[in-house]
């Protein structure tokens, strides 16, 4: 058995747009951003974290992180639902839904909120 939940909404921007986008989303939320490497937290939406991510390359986009206490089990569950693994990286897996929308499966990142909201899967 394992647990998972959608935990993070990420607004991704390449470096040349990142600072302006970060200021914008922090303003939308009325918060001061909390940077952590390529990520910066700009508050919460209900029980979800909202973050702005600096991309090395690629187009601006929004993606979800599904956090799990067992990444391989969650990836297998999502593949059975029709998801596709695009890339396995150290500590997370990049996947796509049946329509091609990209998302990530990551370890637990939201602490107590994960414990409160995660669903348990067989």
Segments (PLM) and residue ranges:
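Vicinal oxygen chelate
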Residues: 1-4, 6-15, 42-44, 48, 53-77, 79-122, ...
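Core segments of cupin and vicinal oxygen chelate
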Residues: 1-49, 73-74, 86
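N-terminal beta-strand motif that seeds the catalytic metal site of vicinal oxygen chelate
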Residues: 1-22, 62-66, 109-122
């Amino acid at each position: 058995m394992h647990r998972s939940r959608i935990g993070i909404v990420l607004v991704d921007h390449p470096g040349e747009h990142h600072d302006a986008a970060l200021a914008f989303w922090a303003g939308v939320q009325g918060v001061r951003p909390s940077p952590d490497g390529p990520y910066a937290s700009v508050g919460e939406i209900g029980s979800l974290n909202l973050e702005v991510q600096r991309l090395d390359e690629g187009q601006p986009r929004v993606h979800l992180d599904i956090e799990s206490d067992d990444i391989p089990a969650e990836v297998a569950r999502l593949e059975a639902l029709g998801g596709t693994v695009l890339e396995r990286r150290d500590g997370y897996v990049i996947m796509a839904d049946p329509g091609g929308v990209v998302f990530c499966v990551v370890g637990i990142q939201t602490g107590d909120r994960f414990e409160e909201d995660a669903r348990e899967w067989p």
